[in-house]
Amino acid sequence: MSVRIVDVREITKPISSPIRNAYIDFTKMTTSLVAVVTDVVREGKRVVGYGFNSNGRYGQGGLIRERFASRILEADPKKLLNEAGDNLDPDKVWAAMMINEKPGGHGERSVAVGTIDMAVWDAVAKIAGKPLFRLLAERHGVKANPRVFVYAAGGYYYPGKGLSMLRGEMRGYLDRGYNVVKMKIGGAPIEEDRMRIEAVLEEIGKDAQLAVDANGRFNLETGIAYAKMLRDYPLFWYEEVGDPLDYALQAALAEFYPGPMATGENLFSHQDARNLLRYGGMRPDRDWLQFDCALSYGLCEYQRTLEVLKTHGWSPSRCIPHGGHQMSLNIAAGLGLGGNESYPDLFQPYGGFPDGVRVENGHITMPDLPGIGFEGKSDLYKEMKALAE
């Protein structure tokens, strides 16, 4: 049976919104949608793998077209196959993409590679005729758990958005089955943020927990001031206080904030993850890690990151990835992560779950769809299918 990649296609799509966090607005936000087209036919249709990058980092069409897609297409197809020769080997495809790339500088490059890598894994699981989460569990010798914790990310700053709108937004998430919600902080003065937090806590009561996210906005002084304010409240976590690479700042905060903290969404390699665990003072009994495979060289690299965690005494259950996409849902279900982010009202059609999947008591159950399961989300698959045709 022939198995080869015959084309890699990319289109940059808008996911813009008038929202903002403490650091950026999303008025010009884009994503790269990628199709990895193979010559394999299943049920009368050519197998195509799909991928896209997470929000917060822009589409990477230039890098994808100029460097990474061409390297895959120029490679000897036989050198991209597994030992049996009946499927692609994602690690070999990944290695082909990274030929002549120097180490370090994990920025936009990691997003471009991660986007293609997502599409490759989608194709691999489809060729195998299995949901990706079950394929991953088999490869790692663990039992898949299709029930995955999800939390609702929102609470952005928005023109004209007062406390009543913020409360209504959070109540809407609870009405849809979520029991952990997240809001932004750091984009307003600390006393205004305190009022916003108290309004949300009053709204959700004992029905849910609240996480807050500073998006890396604070210096140490401000981060400590917020820590002293936030420790008065029973928060799910205090997220990304300062610059993602300022490990000393992160380590210093533990003295002032005994509750759970979370970070990692803007660290894009297993080396950066290792430095966070070495120098960031993260506590494996309470803190959370948010590495996002779509932004950090893909699932091939994410598996290396999980190995780093293991050597430092961390469980994969302390990982709740950023991004709100189905790829991380599959990793969570297949490899035992602690859950996944969700954007119920934002960045559509790329976020969310397959049609018919509902949140119940803060969890969803993964359907048994081949690959990542994009075909089960009709509005998203419409965009993907148009790229592949």
Swiss-Prot record:
Q: Provide the residue positions that the database annotates as binding substrate.
A: 21, 55, 102, 156, 182-184, 213-215, 239, 265, 322, 341-343
Pfam families found in the cross-reference section? MR_MLE_C (PF13378)
GO BP terms, alphabetized = D-galactonate catabolic process; protein homooligomerization
**Under the GO molecular function aspect, what terms does this record hold?**
D(-)-tartrate dehydratase activity; hydro-lyase activity; magnesium ion binding
InterPro entries assigned to the protein according to its UniProt record, in alphabetical order: D-tartrate_dehydratase (IPR034611), DgoD-like (IPR034593), Enolase-like_C_sf (IPR036849), Enolase-like_N (IPR029017), Enolase_C-like (IPR029065), Mandelate_racemase_C (IPR013342)
Question: Metal-binding as a keyword?
Answer: yes
Q: Which residues form the signal peptide?
A: none
The record's listing under Gene3D superfamilies reads: Enolase-like C-terminal domain (3.20.20.120), Enolase-like, N-terminal domain (3.30.390.10)
Q: Which residues bind Mg(2+)?
A: D213, E239, E265
E.C. no: 4.2.1.81
Query: Which cofactor does the UniProt annotation name?
Result: Mg(2+)
Query: Could you tell me what reaction this enzyme catalyses?
Result: (S,S)-tartrate = oxaloacetate + H2O
**Site positions (Transition state stabilizer):** N55, K182, E341
Which UniProt keyword terms apply here?
Lyase, Magnesium, Metal-binding
What family does the database annotate? Belongs to the mandelate racemase/muconate lactonizing enzyme family.
Q: Does the record carry Metal-binding as a key word?
A: yes
| UniProt function note | Catalyzes the dehydration of D-tartrate to oxaloacetate.
UniProt protein name:
D(-)-tartrate dehydratase
Q: Where is the active site?
A: K184 (acceptor), H322 (proton donor/acceptor)
